[in-house]
Amino acid sequence: MVRLTPRLVAIFLVEKTTSGANFVFHWPLQPQVRLQATHHNNDSAESAIGMLDLDDSDDDENNRFTEVADDTHVLGYEKGFLANMLSPRIELCNQKFEIWVDGLTFLGCPVHIGPNGEWAKRRKPRTTVESNASSSHLVSKPESSHPSTGSFEVKSSSSKSRSSMSLFHVVFVLNVPTATVYRPTVNTMYDHIVVKLVTGLKYEQAKRNYVENECIHILKLTEKYSSQNVPFDVYAAQIPHHSNLASVLATTYEALINMHTAYLEINQSINLSLLWPMSVSTNTLENYELQVRPSTILASQTIFSEEHPSSIEPFVAPYWTLLLLKDTDTIMKRVPLLQNSLLSSFIAIVKPNLTFTDIANRLGISVSECFILAKHLIHWRKAIAIPPLLIRNTYVTSPTANLFNLEEESKLFKKEFPSLPSLSTFLAILSFKPRPFASIIPSKDHELVYLEMLAWLCRRNWVYEQNIYMYILVPEEIKKKAIALIESDESSKNDMQLRKQLEQDNGKESIIIDPHSASLLEQKWIQIIAYERGPEMAPLFTSIVKYLNGRFALQTIWVAEGLPRKLMRNILNEYNDYILRWHSW
């Protein structure tokens, strides 16, 4: 799985007025571009090329070049040329703008003033947007993928000062060298960053002429310092301190390249948060995210929708739960909440041993509403979706645990759980032969504190649940029975496809990789195995066959099928000779 990162080189601000196009501002002062060298490595190496090199401890200058930016040039281009190129005609405005030049992608959504001289379409509103809270909601949840079709009404600035600016364009310059990640990266940047930012700027321009005034202010500052022969790097670094719009763009850039949330205040009117969505799960240990952020879970099991797989959209199922990454009080302070709101009630009631179904029942809401609240917290990296933490499950020391932090983490652990043994002691216990977590709990009175301790260890990436995955094992005797059955049945005997599959099989013991898409011969094997333990057990076995593909954890199968845990255990015991089990995270 390739990790998507912004691959952001710079952010430009361009405007077009009655006197022509102007290159107004860019950040950073000296953009750097990663050279797109030719690589002959395997796929995993190629995937790494498409990542922002946050994990490069040694900054290889040979792999970077920097075209010195000054008053008139940036990235080796004349700013006047860029201003004209990035100021398209009106037919291409108010929609996605994407140009690829010399390995760089220029992405944005140019906003053009309407034929009537208005920046926003007027619609009859139910309520007029005036307050900060409404503005924030407006920006964070645009109704379409293009800012041009927003349904908000604004009171335009005075008609006496009709805008001389006809277009403004915030351009995100990307460097995405590999084709495999190009389209997902560009689409993610546009949908999650560009649209939301431009919607907010368009709103303020329509309401208060904000963007035009800021452009005038920035250009005046630039002209003033330039005429005084102040070095470009000196005066350009000061512009964000004197311009709110420049500060917004600089903050956005710095947050994105560091994978942080950009908390923006546009014109002291709109509070907007921008966040690059991250993958919520990985099935490989070679994933850098596991070391830098706890909101990625390590999972071999299928945790995404089979119909709509996604590495970004979190999978939530009724039998899963939510693990908060901070304590409840901390999240309550950081997430803007209305007192007694549904989200605050949801956060207060969430426990890692309660399934989403349990939480929904306690709140008196539907499971789908519960999912919406959970996905909101997951998106903002306040929580992760996991199978419920249960003492009868097996937990082991995480293969990605950062032992360099053990001393510091041990102090935090002791402060959090003063009555328990040390963190090192628990990690040592969990590193031995895997066993149910309940076996290390001294008494029933200790269950609650041990569950809290387990949640603490999970959210800090010290332990993972050890899961059991299964395949159907087909012994030679089953294959012999299948041959006899086929030979005795006239229709099967004359089935050319079945005969061909039979000829290709060597008759030795094998496994069925995916029962859901089993061949005709494999279906025969499954049918014979099912009835090996009698007609009463056969339907029970066939009900779980689709999960025996090595991707679904045993701990979730019985919940997904609504089978009692004891019955599930009986099924597996009965068919033990025909099931291959393996343990993983």
Swiss-Prot record:
Q: Which domain of life is it from?
A: Eukaryota
The record's GO CC annotations read: cytosol; GATOR1 complex; vacuolar membrane
Annotated membrane-spanning segments are: none
Which InterPro entries does this UniProt record tie to the protein? HTH_NPRL3, Npr3
Compositionally biased tracts (Low complexity): 148-157
Q: According to the UniProt entry, which residue ranges have a biased composition of type Polar residues? A: 128-138
Which biological process annotations from GO are given for this protein?
cellular response to amino acid starvation; negative regulation of TORC1 signaling; positive regulation of autophagy
Region feature (Disordered): 117-157
Give the UniProt family note: Belongs to the NPR3 family.
- Which protein, by its recorded name, is this? Nitrogen permease regulator 3-like protein
Q: Supply the source organism's classification.
A: Eukaryota, Fungi, Dikarya, Ascomycota, Taphrinomycotina
